[in-house]
Each structure stands twice: as structure tokens, then as C-alpha cells.
């Protein structure tokens, strides 16, 4: 006997497709005119870009964070909110006082421009993690340096995505 699902016989779409919510943002943006972004955040993002040594290998590896969260239509605000929370984790790297200052400026400045629902705020971002300890101290130092380079690559890519997403929001605001 053939075992065929009832809904496929009559062309009824699977229930999951019917129940999917319409794509919408969980956050509202304040300051869409771009004044705070261009005068404060953009300056710090550009300074951070100059401080990070660019490695051409960075572009080949797309981090999981960016695979899960993107600056799609109607989700720009929630992407920027999550990205700003992710930036806070990089302050722990203690690269320099100036670097931490710019990271804090971009992170806090972005977070203050958004009013997000508890659905987004309730999530705790994953930690950057630590390299596992090994028996050989030199190997451990090498792993930590590779991890640091990987984190800086991720930070560089994340900053570029943040800048692109902000520009997308500002272009959309000027059209109205």
C-alpha cells in the first residue's frame, strides 16, 4: 500500500509554511537622520578599521555569527543590535585603551539608538571562547595567537557589515 501524505495529494502547503511569521524587525531605530551615526559611530568604526591589521585571508572565512544574523530587509535594526552586543565581547581582548574606547563608543552608541523587544534582549550572546590548553607551552601560545588573529578577522568583517547595514538604513530613510 502506498503511504502518501494527505496534504500533498490536495496541494495543501505544509503547515510550517503557513505558520511562519512575516519577516519583521524586533527593534525600532531612533535617529534615522544619521547625525549620531555619521558624527560619532562612523568616526569610531573608521578608527577601528585603521587599527586592525587587515589579512586577505579574513574574507575567505565567513563567521557563523554572520551566517545566522544578516542585514536583510526589515531586519537591519535587529542585526545592528546583535552586532553591537557582540562588539562588547571584544573589549575583553585588551588590545589597547584607544581600541577599547572606540569599541565601547560603537557598541554603546548603537545600542542606545535601538529600542528592541525582550525577544532579542533576552538572548545571551555566545562567548568568544578560549583556546584549549595543550601540553606544549609554545603550541599554546601559537593557538592563542591564531585565535586572536581569527577574532580580529571576525571583528574586521563585522565592522564592515555594521557600516554597510547603517548605510542601508540611512539610504532607506532618505528615500521617504
UniProtKB/Swiss-Prot annotation:
Its main location: secreted. Keywords: Cytokine, Disulfide bond, Glycoprotein, Growth factor, Secreted, Signal. GO terms for molecular function: cytokine activity; growth factor activity; interleukin-7 receptor binding. The keyword Signal applies. It comes from the Eukaryota. GO terms for biological process: B cell proliferation; bone resorption; extrinsic apoptotic signaling pathway; homeostasis of number of cells within a tissue; immune response; interleukin-7-mediated signaling pathway; negative regulation of extrinsic apoptotic signaling pathway in absence of ligand; organ growth. Glycans are attached at residues 94, 115, 140. It is found in: Secreted. Disulfide bonds join 27-165, 58-153, 71-116. The keyword Lipid biosynthesis does not apply. SMART domains: IL7 (SM00127). Residues 1-25 form the signal peptide. One of its GO terms (cellular component) is extracellular space. Belongs to the IL-7/IL-9 family. Hematopoietic growth factor capable of stimulating the proliferation of lymphoid progenitors. It is important for proliferation during certain stages of B-cell maturation. PANTHER family: INTERLEUKIN-7. This is Interleukin-7. It comes from Sus scrofa.
Amino acid at each position: 500500500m502506498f503511504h502518501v501524505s494527505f496534504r500533498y495529494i490536495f496541494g495543501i502547503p505544509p503547515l510550517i509554511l503557513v505558520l511562519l511569521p512575516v519577516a519583521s524587525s524586533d527593534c525600532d531605530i531612533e535617529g534615522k537622520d544619521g547625525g549620531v551615526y555619521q558624527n560619532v559611530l562612523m568616526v569610531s568604526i573608521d578608527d577601528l578599521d585603521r587599527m586592525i591589521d587587515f589579512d586577505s585571508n579574513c574574507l575567505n572565512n565567513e563567521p557563523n555569527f554572520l551566517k545566522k544574523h544578516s542585514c536583510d530587509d526589515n531586519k537591519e535594526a535587529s542585526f545592528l543590535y546583535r552586532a553591537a552586543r557582540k562588539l562588547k565581547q571584544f573589549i575583553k581582548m585588551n588590545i589597547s585603551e584607544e581600541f577599547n574606547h572606540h569599541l565601547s563608543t560603537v557598541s554603546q552608541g548603537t545600542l542606545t539608538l535601538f529600542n528592541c523587544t525582550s525577544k532579542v534582549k533576552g538572548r545571551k550572546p555566545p562567548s568568544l571562547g578560549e583556546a584549549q590548553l595543550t601540553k606544549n607551552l609554545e603550541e599554546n601560545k601559537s593557538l592563542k595567537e591564531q585565535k586572536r588573529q581569527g577574532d580580529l578577522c571576525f571583528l574586521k568583517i563585522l565592522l564592515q557589515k555594521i557600516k554597510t547595514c547603517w548605510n542601508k538604513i540611512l539610504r532607506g530613510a532618505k528615500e521617504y
